[in-house]
Amino acid sequence: DFGVSHVVLKPGAASSQRHWHEDEDEFLVMLAGIATLVEEDGRSLLRPGDMAAFPKGEPNGHHLVNESDSDCTFVVFGRPPTGDCHYPDIDLLWSGGMWRHKEGSSY
């Protein structure tokens, strides 16, 4: 099982909070424009045709930010999240079908 999302990111927008999944692989392909990929190890530009993969269980928080003056477009492949999702920059965890604080208590 997997899903595909077609995403148009407006200038100044981010794809999400930086995150990583315990049980979901993610793969993205840039279609148009330029986005900045922000990961644990730094930042890099993605241009049309560039790809990025995020293996499940690897604690590499990531997201895309559009720091350009025009829209950027990409597709991301993954499966519906069933496991935990971690957000390293904020006090947030998706676990057991609920939003929780990093230490496990519910919001």
Regions found by a protein language model. Name each.
Residues 6, 39-41, 66, 76:
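Residue-level recognition of conserved beta-strand positions in structured domain cores
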Residues 17, 37-38, 54, 61-68:
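Short beta-strand His + acidic residue motifs that chelate non-heme Fe in jelly-roll/DSBH
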Residues 10-14, 34, 43, 58-60, ...:
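Short, charged/polar surface micro-motifs in flexible loops or helix N-caps
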Residues 61, 65-107:
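Double-stranded beta-helix
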Residues 40-57:
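Short acidic-glycine-tyrosine-enriched beta hairpin
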Residues 1-18, 24:
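A short glycine-rich, His/Asp/Glu-containing loop-to-beta-strand
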Residues 23-36, 40-41:
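Glycine- and acidic-residue-biased ligand/ion/polar-headgroup-sensing regions
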